[in-house]
């Protein structure tokens, strides 16, 4: 075979491969469109009657909001991973849907193309908004957004053990719901503002990093998120807090306890508990897993399942048999307890009483 023929065959093969790939990509896009068309068909009449038949439907979104805080929502097709790649250069129009009419949302409630409510109150709960995305080519896609009230979080506890990740520091996350439109975040420890000096403290987005951890880093950490709004002279401020407890390096050894036999009766339920007792009662870092005779992990399934509990340095995984049959007799199940440092296994066998 000459070089010329080999080159010709190569390009023919490449062309066929590209053709097949293009055909496959078209099939995928058609399936995505069909999926959202079916979703449109399942909408209640109070929603579907407002949709433009010339536009594709891009889904619905139910977003959570906290009273007295900013609320933000993207148009569903812009956020959906199946559709977002289709729309790169577009404008978004927002409308509020009422019983017998729809009203355009004012500019003060739109920020960077997203629905934006600076101070969310109960009157906004369960309101419906229709968004229409229109590209420069004239293609359009619509989505529907609803919002529901979420109870504001309390102070979240966090425990850090010295020696675990000292190289990377302790990271504290400011758990605000809508962070994409904030202006800046300031952090406080025990009511005193933290100086972000990139030595002891550094800040990356919504995270505060505490370098060279020590016991004295324990305390209450508050993050204050500042938002800008054209209607309000002063910033809107939202806060979250963490209670950090730094503990000395612990002994991560543990004892695994399991009866070597499960005494059962045919036709009745049975259970057995595998227990891990940590040397240090300050931490619960042991994970227990059950394996069936074939070596597969047992989860929360029918017939035979496992339930995990943990408290005060003691971790338990109970293996339940809903209805013992003869096929279980003689089976051996493995309990595996492990943490980052150690791993232990014990077995138990099903026997008739």
UniProtKB/Swiss-Prot annotation:
One of its GO terms (cellular component) is extracellular region. Residues 1-21 form the signal peptide. PROSITE patterns: IG_LIKE. One of its GO terms (biological process) is symbiont-mediated suppression of host type I interferon-mediated signaling pathway. SUPFAM superfamilies: Immunoglobulin. InterPro entries: Ig-like_dom, Ig-like_dom_sf, Ig-like_fold, Ig_sub, IL-1_rcpt_fam, Immunoglobulin_dom. It is found in: Secreted. Its main location: secreted. Keywords: Disulfide bond, Early protein, Glycoprotein, Host-virus interaction, Immunoglobulin domain, Inhibition of host innate immune response by virus, Inhibition of host interferon signaling pathway by virus, Interferon antiviral system evasion, Repeat, Secreted, Signal, Viral immunoevasion. Residues 248-347 form the Ig-like V-type domain. CDD domains: Ig. PANTHER family: INTERLEUKIN-1 RECEPTOR FAMILY MEMBER, X-LINKED INTERLEUKIN-1 RECEPTOR ACCESSORY PROTEIN-LIKE 2. Counteracts the antiviral effects of host IFN-alpha/beta and key IFN-inducible proteins involved in viral RNA degradation suxh as host OAS1. Acts as a soluble IFN-alpha receptor and thus inhibits the interaction between host IFN-alpha and its receptor. Interacts with host IFNA1. Belongs to the interleukin-1 receptor family. This is Soluble interferon alpha/beta receptor OPG204.
């Amino acid at each position: 075979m000459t070089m010329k023929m080999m080159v010709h065959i190569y390009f023919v093969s490449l062309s066929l491969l590209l053709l097949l790939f293009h055909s496959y990509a078209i099939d995928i896009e058609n399936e995505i469109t069909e999926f959202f068309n079916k979703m449109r068909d399942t909408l209640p009449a109070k929603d579907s009657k407002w949709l433009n038949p010339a536009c594709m439907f891009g889904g619905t979104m139910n977003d959570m909001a906290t009273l007295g805080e900013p609320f933000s929502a993207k148009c569903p097709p812009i956020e959906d991973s199946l559709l977002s790649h289709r729309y790169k250069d577009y404008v978004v129009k927002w409308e509020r849907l009422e019983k017998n009419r729809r009203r355009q949302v004012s500019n003060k409630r739109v920020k960077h193309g997203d629905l934006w409510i600076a101070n969310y109150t109960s009157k906004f709960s369960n309101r419906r908004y229709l968004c229409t995305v229109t590209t420069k080519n004239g293609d359009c896609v619509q989505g529907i957004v609803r919002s529901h009230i979420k109870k504001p979080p309390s102070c979240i506890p966090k425990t850090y053990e010295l020696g675990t990740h000292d190289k990377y520091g302790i990271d504290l996350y400011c758990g605000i719901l809508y962070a994409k439109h904030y202006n800046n975040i300031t952090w406080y420890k025990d009511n005193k503002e933290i100086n972000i000096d990139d030595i002891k403290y550094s800040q990356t987005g919504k995270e505060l990093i505490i370098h060279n951890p020590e016991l004295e880093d324990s305390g209450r950490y508050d993050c204050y998120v500042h938002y800008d709004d054209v209607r309000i002279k002063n910033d809107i401020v939202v806060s979250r807090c963490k209670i950090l407890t730094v503990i000395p390096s612990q002994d991560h050894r543990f004892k695994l306890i399991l009866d070597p036999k499960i005494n059962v009766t045919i036709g009745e339920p049975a259970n057995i508990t595998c227990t891990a007792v940590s040397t240090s009662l300050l931490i619960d870092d042991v994970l227990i897993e059950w394996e069936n005779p074939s070596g597969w992990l047992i989860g929360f399934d029918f017939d035979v399942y496992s339930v995990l509990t943990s408290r005060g340095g003691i971790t338990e995984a109970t293996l339940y048999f809903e209805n013992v049959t003869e096929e279980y007799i003689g089976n051996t199940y493995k309990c595996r307890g492990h943490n980052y440092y150690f791993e232990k296994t014990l077995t138990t066998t099903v026997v008739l009483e």
